[in-house]
Amino acid sequence: VVDPAPDRRWTATYAAWADELPGWLAPSAVAATVERPMAWGTRAHRIDRPYVVLDTERLRESLDIAGAEVVADRARELTAKTVTLTDGRILDGRRVIDVRGITRSPAFAEQTAYGLVLDESRCQGLEPLFMDWRADNGAPADAPRSFLYAVPLGGGQTLLEETCLAGRPALDGAALRDRLHHRLRSRGIELAGDERVERVRFPVGGGRPGRFTFGAAGGFGHPATGYSVAASLTAADAVAAGETVWPASARAVHRLRAAGLRALLALPPTDLPVFSTRFSLCRPPRSALTF
C-alpha cells in the first residue's frame, strides 16, 4: 500500500444508503442512521430508505490491512505490475491498482460544499434533510442552485452543509458559506463563529472503469451525485481477488449515469428542484441513477 501520509486522520463526512453497504462493515463504523430522510424539492417528501452516516475514524480503523506492507511515499509512475515512487524506488507486484482519485481539471464538473458542525441542541426544529432546495439562502432566483444537507454525526452533533450538487465551474466556498449563513439565520439558527468547518471540493467526472483502477479513479463515483464510498466498499473484496467488477451491464449503467450528469449540468437553475423531486420519488429498482 503506497500512501504519502498513511497515518493521517480522515476528516470528511461519509454517508450512504444502508442497503448499499457491504454486510461485513463493522457496526461501530456507523455513527447515525436516519430511517426516512426528508427531501425538499418543489415540495416535502420522505424517502423510504434508511440513510447511514459513517464514523470516519472507526471506519478507517475497521479496514484491516494487516499483512500488507505500507510505504509512505507517492506513486510517480504506474504499470500493470510496477510502481515507481518519487524517491526512485520501484515496487513490483502481481497487479497494481490505481486508487489515487481524480486530478482536478476545468474539463470535469465538481461538487462543492461548505458546512458547519453544531450541537444538536442548537438545531431544534430542524430534522435531517437529504436535499433541501428551498430558496431561503439569499441567492438570486437565476443564480446556480445549491441545497442544504443536514445530517446527524452522532455524539450530539449535526452537520449543516450548503452544497452545489455539480457545476462546471462549481460554486466556490465563499458563496456557499454566505448562502449557508443566510439560510440558517432565516430559520432561526444563530452561529457563534467558532463552529467546526467542513469544506468539500472534488470532481464528479473523469473516473475510468477498468481492471487496474479503483474508487473514484476507477469510475466508482456516481457522476451525477458524487457518492462513491458504498460502491467502493462493496467491490473491494472482488477487486482484491482479481475478479471482474465491470461487466457490460455495469459499464452501460456507468454511461447512463454520465449522461445524467450532462443533463444535470444543462438544466436551468429553476428546474433543479423539479428534477430532484421527481428523481427522489423513484424507487431504487426503477432508477439506474440511484443516489
What do these predicted regions represent?
Residues 1-43, 58, 114, 118:
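N-terminal FAD cofactor-binding segment of flavoenzymes
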Residues 2, 97, 215:
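Active-site flanking residues adjacent to catalytic metal/cofactor-binding acidic residues
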Residues 44-46, 165-167, 219-221:
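A short, flexible beta-alpha/helix-coil linker loop
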Residues 45-59:
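An N-terminal, globular interaction/scaffold subdomain
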Residues 50-52, 170-174, 224-228:
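Short, solvent-exposed loop/turn segments at secondary-structure boundaries
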Residues 66-192, 204-208, 212:
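Predominantly flavin-linked oxidoreductase catalytic cores and closely associated redox partners
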Residues 205-261:
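Conserved mid-domain beta->alpha element of the FAD-binding
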Residues 237-291:
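Long, low-complexity C-terminal extensions of enzymes
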